[in-house]
């Protein structure tokens, strides 16, 4: 994927990081040329991550030294994903627009709601 200059500007203006864009591309739903990760989907993903973290912490207490480091690594990765998902949830969701392999723009889902 190629980030355009426009994409970099919009990410800077709207407080989106590359990790948030990558997370949206991997977990979001596709609608036309957009990847959308809304609040509801993000909340479902967070509950899934929380359950996995809970299970891994339970497995750590078993004191099985052969898989201890693997579990710690997986736990660390899940915590990073959880942190990113929480940022996206705070924004109300994110939309990323693509044109082929070029990332065109990104915006918060609730950015078009006007009072």
Please place each PLM-identified region on the residue numbering.
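Ribonuclease/tRNase effector modules and their secretory precursors
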Residues: 1-115
């Amino acid at each position: 994927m190629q980030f355009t200059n426009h994409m970099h500007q919009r990410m800077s203006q709207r407080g989106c990081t590359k990790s948030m864009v990558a997370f949206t591309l991997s977990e979001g739903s596709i609608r036309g040329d957009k990847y959308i990760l809304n609040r509801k989907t993000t909340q479902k993903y967070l509950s899934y991550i929380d359950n996995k973290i809970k299970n891994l912490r339970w497995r750590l207490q078993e004191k099985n030294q052969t898989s201890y480091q693997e579990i710690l690594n997986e736990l660390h990765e899940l915590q990073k994903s959880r942190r990113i998902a929480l940022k996206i949830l705070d924004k109300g969701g994110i939309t990323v627009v693509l044109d082929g392999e070029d990332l065109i723009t990104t915006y918060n889902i609730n950015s078009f709601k006007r009072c």
